[in-house]
C-alpha cells in the first residue's frame, strides 16, 4: 500500500468513526455532511469524496462495526471448549449493554432504511446471515458434543436470535422494567428452553478450620 493509499484509508476510517458516533447520537436523518466533517476534523469535501451519500455512509458504518464485532466474537468463543460458555459469551457480546447502546441505535437506522432501500436491505441481509451463522455454529457445536438437546440448530438459532434482538431493542429504548442483568437472564432462560437446562456445578464442601 502506498503512502497515499495509507493516508486515504486513515481518513476514511476517521470519517466512519465520526459518522458512527453521530448516527448513534442523533439519528441518520439529523446529521449533515458538515457535522461529520467537523467531528472528523476534515473538510466536507473529504467526506463526500469517500461517501457520496448518507446512505453509503450508513452502509459502510454498519459494515465496519459488524465486521469488527464478529471478528472479535469468533476469536473469543473459539477459545471456549464448553458449549454453554460459548453460547453465554456470544449472548453477552451480542446483546445491548445499556439504554441508547450505540451499536444497537446504528442497527435501528439500518432496519428503518432497509425497509425502503434495496441497497441497505442487501447489506442488512449479508450481515444478519453472518451473525446468524455464528450462532448456529455454536448451537451445532453444542449439539454435536451431546450437550444441547436440539435436532434443528438453524431453528433454535432463529428463535434465540429473536429473543436477543427483542430484549436488546427494549433495553436500548430504555424500558423501565429491563436492565442488563435481567436481559441476560431472559436470554439464558430462552436458550435453556430450546437447548436443555444448563447443569448446575456441584457445590464443594469446605473443610472447617479450627
Where in the sequence are the language-model features?
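Hydrophobic alpha-helical connector segments
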Residues: 60, 71-104, 156-160, 184, ...
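Amphipathic alpha-helical packing segments from all-alpha helical-bundle domains
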Residues: 70-71, 75, 100-108, 118-144, ...
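Residues in soluble alpha-helical coiled-coils and helical-bundle/repeat scaffolds
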Residues: 52-56, 78-81, 98-99, 115, ...
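Short coil/turn segments at alpha/beta junctions that flank glycine-rich nucleotide-binding fingerprints
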Residues: 25-29, 80, 145
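Helix-loop "lid/cap" segments that line or gate small-molecule binding pockets
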Residues: 76, 92-98, 106-116, 190-194
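Helix-turn-helix
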Residues: 10, 14, 21-56, 60
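Short, basic, alpha-helical segments at the C-terminal edge of helix-turn-helix-like DNA-binding modules
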Residues: 63-68
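Hydrophobic/aromatic-rich alpha-helical bundle segments in the mid-to-C-terminal region
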Residues: 119-125, 129, 143-191, 198-210
Amino acid at each position: 500500500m502506498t503512502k497515499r493509499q495509507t493516508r486515504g484509508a486513515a481518513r476514511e476510517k476517521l470519517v466512519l468513526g465520526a459518522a458512527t458516533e453521530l448516527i448513534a447520537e442523533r439519528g441518520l436523518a439529523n446529521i449533515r455532511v458538515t457535522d461529520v466533517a467537523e467531528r472528523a476534523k476534515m473538510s466536507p469535501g473529504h467526506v463526500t469524496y469517500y461517501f457520496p451519500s448518507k446512505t453509503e455512509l450508513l452502509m459502510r458504518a454498519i459494515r465496519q462495526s459488524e465486521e469488527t464485532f464478529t471478528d472479535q466474537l469468533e476469536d473469543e468463543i473459539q477459545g471456549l471448549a464448553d458449549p454453554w460458555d460459548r453460547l453465554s459469551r456470544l449472548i453477552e457480546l451480542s446483546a445491548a449493554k445499556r439504554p441508547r447502546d450505540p451499536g444497537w441505535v446504528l442497527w435501528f437506522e439500518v432496519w428503518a432504511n432497509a425497509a425502503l432501500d434495496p441497497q441497505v436491505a442487501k447489506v442488512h441481509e449479508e450481515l444478519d446471515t453472518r451473525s446468524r451463522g455464528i450462532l448456529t455454529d455454536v448451537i451445532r457445536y453444542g449439539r454435536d458434543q451431546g450437550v444441547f438437546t436440539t435436532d434443528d440448530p438453524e431453528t433454535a438459532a432463529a428463535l434465540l436470535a429473536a429473543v436477543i434482538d427483542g430484549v436488546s431493542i427494549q433495553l436500548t429504548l430504555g424500558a423501565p422494567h429491563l436492565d442488563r442483568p435481567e436481559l441476560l437472564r431472559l436470554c439464558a432462560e430462552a436458550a435453556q428452553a430450546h437447548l436443555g437446562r444448563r447443569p448446575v456445578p456441584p457445590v464443594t464442601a469446605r473443610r472447617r478450620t479450627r
